[in-house]
Amino acid sequence: SRGLGDVYKRQIMQSEDAGFFYHNGFIPSAIRESLIQDIKERRFARGGSTLSMQLVKNVFLSRNKTIARKLEEMLIVWLIESDHLTSKERMFEVYLNIAEWGPMIYGAAEASRYYFAKEPSQLNLAECIFMASIIPKPKQVRYCFDGLRLKPYYEDFYRVILDRLVDRGLISSEEAVGVTPESVEITGPAKEYLTATQSRSPRSSQPLDQK
């Protein structure tokens, strides 16, 4: 069978930027929709960022949400992508090593150990889907749990993601059978963090729609 480490990487790409290997760093329609929503709400309500833009933001720029920073972000992405300063494969590798997966948890390897006491290549499919779902709102991961189990609304989320993975040939329909959020068991150091924070807030945070 294929290595689940590969499925893990592909699921993250499907979640964050499915067209990463095919675009030049920008998705004009996503940027346009983001700007329209930001103007309507008079705040930075929607990202519209490609994986390339997220990488540049995390490596080169501050996290401040300003128009000037967004323009700087787009300029650096254009320079990197248009001049082919590095490969897409290398960009994705760096992204996996620096992306945030929880409060002060950075990189896929650290995150896998933090939540499951495993290396990324050892994760099962249910764990891969959970890990990919964290990236859009890493600081809100505690709100996804009742105790140490994912909240019931993850059922629909998993169904959508599994259907997408099967449709795109990333997994077989047989591999999707029995993959549910109920099978996700937090066994790493995150167990202590989640236990300590569960009683602090009743806030709910549903998984984001995947790109």
Go through the PLM ranges and name each one:
Residues 62-68:
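A short, charged, and often flexible helix/loop element on the N-terminal side
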Residues 8-10, 27, 47-51, 72, ...:
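Envelope-exposed proteins and targeting segments
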Residues 3-7:
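Short, small-residue-biased leader/transition segments that mark boundaries at the very start
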Residues 77-211:
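Non-catalytic, structured segments within soluble enzyme domains
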Residues 18-21, 28, 45, 61, ...:
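Solvent-exposed loop/turn segments at secondary-structure junctions
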Residues 32-34, 70-78:
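Membrane-interfacial and juxtamembrane segments of integral membrane proteins
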Residues 10-40:
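Membrane-embedded segments
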